[in-house]
């Protein structure tokens, strides 16, 4: 992406049709300079349902979407374990990528993704909505008024009663750290604007 698209809408492809897509589309539908061109999923049936629900013009396979020259960027809303593979395929095809959080299930995956983005000179971003949340920007504006930040305490949680959910399955990259802990880590880094010197962790 760049100067070549400054005078037209950014054309998006949905590379997946996961549950989070419904919430993402509520925001996307309010943005004037983006156009959802097509949707792809593991099954054509799932993609077709999404296309009908959100009036998306085309239903494609993953391969068809990545070969399309009229798609500038793809959004990847699939389970955590599939993020890296799809993101790298998209970037190798010359597409910019917005991938749901966590972008990778470990730092090694993220490093591979960023290396791929640099090699192919495309945009790569992890979709963390709190990064642009108005309240966060307001907090940042007042940090200088309170002096040096010495302690940051965060809590981000929700109730989950489905013990069979992938969120509870470590073999499917489940667990609180990858699902919601990323918000606490992003917030802390935004506030401190520094890399950690060392990390102490615990679990039970």
Annotated model-derived regions:
Residues 2-54:
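N-terminal Rossmann-like dinucleotide-binding module
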Residues 11, 34-38, 72-74, 124, ...:
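Short active-site oxyanion
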Residues 23, 49, 64, 73, ...:
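Alpha-helical elements of Rossmann-like donor-binding domains used by nucleotide-donor carbohydrate transfer enzymes
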Residues 97-100, 124-127, 200:
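Short catalytic-loop micro-motif centered on adjacent basic/acidic residues
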């Amino acid at each position: 992406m760049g100067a070549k698209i400054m005078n037209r809408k950014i054309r998006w492809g949905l590379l997946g049709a996961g549950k989070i897509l419904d919430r993402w589309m509520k925001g996307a539908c309010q943005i004037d300079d983006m156009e959802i061109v097509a949707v792809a999923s593991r099954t054509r049936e799932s993609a077709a349902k999404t296309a009908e629900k959100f009036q998306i013009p085309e239903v494609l396979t993953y391969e068809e979407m990545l070969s399309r020259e009229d798609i500038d960027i793809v959004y990847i809303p699939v389970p955590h374990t599939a993020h890296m593979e799809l993101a790298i395929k998209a970037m190798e095809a010359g597409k910019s990528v917005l991938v749901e959080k966590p972008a990778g299930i470990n730092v090694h995956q993220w490093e591979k993704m960023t290396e791929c983005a640099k090699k192919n000179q495309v945009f790569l971003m992890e979709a963390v909505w709190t990064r642009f949340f108005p309240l966060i920007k307001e907090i940042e504006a007042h940090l200088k008024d309170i002096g040096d930040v010495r302690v940051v305490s965060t809590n981000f949680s929700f109730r989950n009663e489905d013990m069979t959910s992938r969120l509870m399955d470590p073999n499917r990259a489940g667990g609180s750290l990858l699902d919601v802990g990323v918000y606490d880590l992003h917030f802390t880094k935004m506030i401190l604007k520094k890399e950690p010197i060392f990390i102490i962790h615990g679990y039970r």
